[in-house]
Amino acid sequence: MLRLTNKRREEASVKRALTLENEIELIEGCRAGKDSARKELYTLYSKQMLAVCYRYTGDVDAAHDVLHDGFIKIFTHFAFRGECALSTWVTRVMVTQAIDYLRKQQRFSQLVVNEE
């Protein structure tokens, strides 16, 4: 029998509780810059998005950097237009952030090779 820890139970209940009405409130709160909405968004998606970032970077530290940069981008430029699910949009932001990170790493490694 699978037993969930209290933290996992809490996360599962938060995810189940994200109905369309709650999602709209969360989106509006993030647009308004409310810290409580930002915290809820981070709590809902950070673990899943860390896995996405890790799949692209292959490095735990880099994945954490990409995750944090992605959430900073989301919180400073909340450009969600409602054309897809919020989770899809957050994933897209993280994937784009991971690809940008990899491009910068590639440019940096080329600079180091060229200088030698």
Locate each region found by the language model:
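Short, structured helix-loop boundary elements
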Residues: 24-27, 35-39, 60, 64, ...
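Structural recognition of an alpha-helix C-terminal capping motif at a helix-to-coil junction
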Residues: 51, 65-72, 84-96
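A short, charge-rich alpha-helical start-of-domain segment used by transcription regulators
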Residues: 27-51
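Conserved RNAP core-binding helix
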Residues: 26, 42, 50, 60-77
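Sigma70-family region 2
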Residues: 31-32, 68-86, 104-106
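Intrinsic, short, N-terminal disordered tails of RNA polymerase sigma-factor systems
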Residues: 1-28, 40, 116
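Arg/Lys-rich amphipathic alpha helix in sigma70-family domain 2
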Residues: 81, 92-113
